[in-house]
Structures are given as structure tokens and as C-alpha cells.
From Swiss-Prot:
GO cellular component terms attached to this protein's record: cytoplasm
Co-factor(s): Zn(2+)
Chain segments annotated as coiled-coil in the UniProt record: none
Protein encoded by which gene: dnaJ1
J domain span: 4-68
Lineage: Bacteria, Bacillati, Actinomycetota, Actinomycetes, Mycobacteriales
Alphabetically ordered keywords of this record: Chaperone, Cytoplasm, DNA replication, Metal-binding, Repeat, Stress response, Zinc, Zinc-finger
SUBUNIT field: Homodimer.
Name of the protein described by the UniProt record: Chaperone protein DnaJ 1
Notes concerning its domains: The J domain is necessary and sufficient to stimulate DnaK ATPase activity. Zinc center 1 plays an important role in the autonomous, DnaK-independent chaperone activity of DnaJ. Zinc center 2 is essential for interaction with DnaK and for DnaJ activity.
InterPro entries reported for this sequence: DnaJ, DnaJ_C, DnaJ_domain, HSP40/DnaJ_pept-bd, HSP_DnaJ_Cys-rich_dom, HSP_DnaJ_Cys-rich_dom_sf, J_dom_sf
Family: Belongs to the DnaJ family.
Gene Ontology BP terms: chaperone cofactor-dependent protein refolding; DNA replication; protein refolding; response to heat
Function: Participates actively in the response to hyperosmotic and heat shock by preventing the aggregation of stress-denatured proteins and by disaggregating proteins, also in an autonomous, DnaK-independent fashion. Unfolded proteins bind initially to DnaJ; upon interaction with the DnaJ-bound protein, DnaK hydrolyzes its bound ATP, resulting in the formation of a stable complex. GrpE releases ADP from DnaK; ATP binding to DnaK triggers the release of the substrate protein, thus completing the reaction cycle.
Residue ranges of CXXCXGXG motif repeats: 142-149, 159-166, 185-192, 199-206
Amino acid sequence: MARDYYGILGVDRNATDSEIKKAYRKLARKYHPDVNPSEEAAEKFREASVAHEVLTDPDKRRIVDMGGDPMEQGGGAGHPGGFGSGGLGDIFDAFFGGGAGSRGPRSRVQPGSDTLWRTSITLEEAFTGVKKDLTLDTAVLCSKCHGSGSASNAKPKTCGTCHGSGEIQEVQRSFLGNVMTSRPCHTCNGTGEVIPDPCDECAGDGRVRARRDIVADIPAGIQSGMRIRMAGQGEVGAGGGPAGDLYVEVMVRPHAVFTRDGDDLHASIRVPMIDAALGSELEVESLTGEEITVVIPAGTQPNQVITLEGEGMPRLRAEGRGDLMAHVDLFVPTEIDDRTRELLEQIRDYRRDNSSVHREGEEHGGLFDKLKSKFRNR
């Protein structure tokens, strides 16, 4: 089972790198063996160090966010109870903001970040599926240097400040004594290399900000809050690194008539009192504008739900559709003509004089059938 690295540090899943480092420093000061010699503290210190290592590594953090555990996939500490690769440096980073030992330069070419884009569609578009045009402000490959960062396509040279290590080492005094710490080189930004003739378009980064048009194919049956992954459509990485992914989050706007519940649709239908009593068939308009026949059973009650199977939303990437739930809104007229009033009064008198409408209707079929016929013909 994957460990809860966010819980170990006491941060939420949306925590920034600075928040993660701040939480780690707080725990490191509390549980460091030189401050707290207990075995329990040593275990908590080890857990915090591993969690910090994982969550400050973009690739490892992505594995965690997908439900995995990078420390169980050959990407973490190699020895039980150890601090993992770079763990000792993380300990000193908690106290002094730098590492105790050299970790080596980071690659100048970095993978790009994922991008989240939110868009809204109508319920009709969610029913049929739709292609949505998106315009993104994102990092794209520099068209002038094609990602190399160099104006003349020259190869990077070793940084003269850090001599290729990517780090600047310093000696700091602490309660532990003199400690050698290291920080990313400010000249090469920790890569150990510099571009001798930076591209004037991207300043040597290999990418620029630009607006880019993308078409998102939104499938039929999608629901609010769902995300569509478009691989390689995110931001291009530094140094012309591979682009991240684009996630399009869809919000389905409310509809004036239909309410959605999963793959089912709900709608109110107005049923005249006589049709509810005698039974009838009504034509209603579906979400797509087609006419649907709704059978109203005799004796239908107010707020009764009539299910129309297979008339709901399409199932996402599957066959079939949900159901349409028709909620009966019983309509009682506020104004009636004299003939209608006369017939209704006859029904009322008939019901008063007979204890059972069904039984007496059979015995006095002439009057009941006559009234029934007249109401059907109105």
C-alpha cells in the first residue's frame, strides 16, 4: 500500500515546494537525532526525510499523485532505515537551506509541466459530444533556436563559476560545528553548463511564452468535473525538453428543462387532471428536439415518476443510454367553460352517490362511459 507522504509532512496535496520544505524543516528540527535521541524520533525523522525527497522530486511526486509509491519502484532509498539518495543533503537543507554533499548538476533539459484548462459545455453538447477550440497561453519551443538555447546552435560550455558541479559550496557555523553546505550555482542555475551565445528570442531557455490553439475532442456522455488528458499538449520543458500533458476539465452548464443525475435525466411534464384520471398519451420534446411519447397510466398521481428507459444520456465510452424520469406535474384548470363545469358536477354527484367509482361505474355504465367519452374528446 502506498505511503501517505503528504500526511507524513502534514501538508495537503496541493502544497507548493516551499510549503513542503517548510514543513520538513519544522519536523527535522523536532526529530533530528542530535536534538531528540529517542528511537521513535529517529523513525519519524527518517520518514520525514523520505517524504521530503519524494515530494520535492517532480517525477516521484507525479507517481504519488497517481496512487503509486516511487520508493517501492526502485526510485527511493536503497537500504532499510536509510535516508535514500540525497537524504543526507536534505537533513542539512532543513537547517541551513543547502546540502551537505554534492548532488551533481541537474540536467539543463527538463520535462515540461502539465497544464490544467477548464471549459464549459451545454447539456446538449454533453449528449452528442463536441470538439472545443481552446486558446492557451503556454510555453512553446523557441522557433529561432529550436530549443537549443543557443543563437548559433553551439554546444553548452562548462560553467566557470561552479566548474560543472552545478553547486557553490560554503562553510557555515552551527551547533553541530562547521558544516559544509552547497547551493545551486547562480550562474548556471545548477546545470553546470552555460550557453556561450544565448538565443536573443528565448534568452537561452529554449522556450518562449505564446498563445496556441488546440482542439479538445470531448466525448458524448461526459459529466461535470471529468478531465480529458491530452498527452504532450502541456508546456514545453526548459532546454527544449519534452512537453507535459494538458488536462481539460469539463463543466456541464445547467439546463432550463432537464436535470442530470449520472446517466439519467429528470424533467417535469404537465399532465391535465382528466388525462391523469383516465389515462392518456402525451408528446414531449427530448433533449435533442425529438418527440417522445409518454404513456400516462389511468389514475396517475401528482409527482408520480414515469420512467422512459433508454431516453437519458449516452454512457461514456460505452453502449446504451440512461433513462428519462418524467415527474408528473398535475394541471388543474383555474377557468372552465359551462359545459365542462356541468360534466364535472355530474362526476362529483356520481361519486357522492356511490361508494366505489369502479363498481358503480360498471352498474351505471351509460352515464360513466358517456362522461368518459366526452372528456376524452375535449
